């Protein structure tokens, strides 16, 4: 009797294993370089990754994708975006938490993606500096959309973006929306207000 049950369980497990989807292969690392205590990985598909924080196994691409290096290899991390709850406020998983930016959970800590990208590819922010999303979309954490500015510049750029959105809405012209304006043009607009 016991033997039959054991054999049945083995068969059931084998059937379950057949139904499981095959795992996607991990990206293969072509080479790794360490310079200034910061690791740089190049994948076979041409993507270059940099380590944001030394000692933490998070690697970032210029496109804002986050990978973690584990014992099993390099794995893409899930970036969590905040959803609007019934009250129209942004929240994570329906629970308000005051967190506005996309983040990654890694080893029981939350890391904002835009901060990790600037740490990996630009430099750490100094006293009185902030990270500016050029097109005003905080969910867009690509390196091309991020820059380090002073608090005053960030405030002025936010005012300009609000005005552009308002005029686009009033004139019903989507080409005036900051999300549709090329970044080179936005940077020229912002260059006029720099301190």
Show where each model-derived region lies.
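Conserved recognition-core residues within compact binding domains
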Residues: 2-5, 9-130, 137-190
């Amino acid at each position: 009797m016991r033997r039959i049950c054991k054999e049945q369980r083995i068969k059931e497990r084998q059937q379950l294993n057949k139904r499981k989807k095959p795992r996607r292969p991990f990206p293969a690392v072509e080479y790794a370089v360490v310079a200034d205590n910061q690791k740089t990985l190049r994948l076979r598909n041409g993507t270059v990754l940099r380590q944001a924080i030394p000692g933490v196994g998070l690697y970032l691409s210029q496109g804002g994708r986050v990978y973690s290096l584990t014992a099993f290899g390099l794995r893409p991390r899930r970036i969590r975006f905040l959803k609007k709850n019934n009250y129209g406020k942004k929240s994570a998983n329906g629970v308000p938490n005051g967190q506005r930016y996309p983040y990654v959970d890694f080893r029981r800590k939350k890391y904002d993606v835009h901060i990790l990208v600037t740490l990996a590819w630009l430099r750490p922010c100094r006293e009185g500096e902030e990270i500016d999303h050029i097109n005003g979309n905080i969910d867009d954490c690509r390196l091309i959309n991020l820059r380090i500015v002073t608090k005053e510049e960030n405030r002025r750029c936010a005012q300009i973006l609000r005005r552009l959105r308002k005029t686009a809405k009033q004139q019903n012209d989507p080409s005036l929306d900051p999300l549709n304006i090329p970044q080179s043009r936005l940077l020229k607009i912002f260059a006029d207000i720099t301190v």
